[in-house]
């Protein structure tokens, strides 16, 4: 079975440095597994590897999607699997790097096993309680073919169909079809990098200041001047939405910096929680291990 190395972990943990060294040692080619670094024009705020870094080993899918595009995990799965196949055909090793757990689940499990969003389910049930029949109408609008196959009173299946569409952005019929056609035989070896909380928070805070020094505000200003709407998913993410508020005069500079730090720390916490649920992942605490030891440990696990 074709082996694929996955280097995952929360934002600012240090995935880039480790993955570069690993890729150099195993004839690896790095493939983006980050839902923000996949967009073009979003460089500083997403901590996308710079051009000098990309020259060290081949990088793929970074900046490959226009921010105006409605890009889903389903779209990512198709792009990433194609790229993985190309790398393997060259006799090299695919190294997936990033912190988007949903992308990893899409590759490993497809979408029939999309994790439940209990917050969303609770919200949908409240909608139905307050307005009986509304979820059926919502499903008809989102996925009319699926709605025809579910009894109007089967609230559980209606909620699940809506949930999958909201999470993935695709219809159930397309998911079933894709899963039937999915014949990839990739063997994913998953490494999750982590650090002690205080150290990770300090790295996040330092990165925020570094991004601002490197021109994050100007990057956002340029995106707006190019006509990119603030309602786009790409611009409604951490680091960008706060700068937009600052540029529009809704918050001052210090509050902008504070919000980016807090929101990034909370995001890192959610990433860690998500990765904790992935069975078979090998966790490595970078706070307790030198980079050289980490690289050797990963190589011994993978090779």
UniProtKB/Swiss-Prot annotation:
Recorded catalytic activity of this chain's protein: adenosine(37) in tRNA + dimethylallyl diphosphate = N(6)-dimethylallyladenosine(37) in tRNA + diphosphate
EC class of the enzyme, as a word: transferase
Residues marked Interaction with substrate tRNA (site): 100
Gene3D superfamilies (UniProt xref): 1.10.20.140, P-loop containing nucleotide triphosphate hydrolases
Positions with a binding annotation for substrate: 11-16
Matches recorded under InterPro entries: Dimethylallyltransferase, IPT, P-loop_NTPase
One BP annotation, GO: tRNA modification
GO terms assigned for molecular function: ATP binding; tRNA dimethylallyltransferase activity
Function noted in UniProt: Catalyzes the transfer of a dimethylallyl group onto the adenine at position 37 in tRNAs that read codons beginning with uridine, leading to the formation of N6-(dimethylallyl)adenosine (i(6)A).
Binding partners and assembly: Monomer.
PANTHER family, per database record: TRNA DIMETHYLALLYLTRANSFERASE
Name of this protein: tRNA dimethylallyltransferase
Organism: Petrotoga mobilis (strain DSM 10674 / SJ95)
Upper taxonomic lineage: Bacteria, Thermotogati, Thermotogota, Thermotogae, Petrotogales
Gene: miaA
């Amino acid at each position: 079975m074709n082996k694929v190395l996955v280097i995952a972990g929360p934002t600012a943990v240090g995935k880039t440095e480790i993955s570069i060294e690993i890729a150099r040692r195993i004839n690896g080619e790095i493939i983006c597994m980050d839902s923000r670094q996949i967009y073009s024009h979003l460089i500083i705020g997403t901590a996308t590897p710079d051009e000098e870094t990309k020259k060290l080993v081949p990088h793929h899918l970074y900046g490959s999607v226009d921010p105006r595009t409605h890009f889903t995990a389903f779209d990512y799965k198709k792009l990433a699997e194609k790229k993985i196949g190309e790398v393997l055909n060259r006799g090299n090793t695919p190294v997936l790097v990033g912190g988007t757990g949903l992308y990893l689940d899409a590759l490993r499990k497809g979408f029939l096993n999309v994790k439940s969003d209990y917050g969303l389910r609770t919200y949908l049930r409240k909608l139905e309680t307050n307005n009986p029949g509304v979820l059926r109408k919502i499903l008809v609008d989102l996925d009319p073919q699926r709605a025809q196959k579910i009894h109007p009173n089967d609230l559980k299946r209606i909620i699940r169909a809506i949930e999958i569409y909201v999470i993935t952005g695709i219809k159930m019929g397309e998911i079933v079809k894709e899963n039937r056609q999915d014949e990839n035989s990739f063997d994913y070896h998953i490494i999750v990098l982590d650090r002690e909380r205080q150290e990770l928070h300090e790295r996040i805070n330092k990165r925020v200041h570094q991004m601002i020094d490197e021109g994050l505000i100007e990057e956002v200003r340029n995106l707006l001047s190019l006509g990119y709407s603030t309602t786009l998913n790409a611009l409604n993410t951490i680091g960008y939405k706060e700068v937009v508020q600052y540029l529009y005069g809704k918050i001052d500079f210090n509050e902008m910096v504070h919000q980016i730090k807090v929101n990034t720390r909370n995001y890192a916490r959610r990433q860690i929680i998500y990765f904790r649920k992935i069975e078979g992942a090998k966790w490595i605490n970078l706070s307790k291990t030198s980079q050289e030891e980490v690289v050797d440990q990963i190589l011994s696990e993978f090779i």
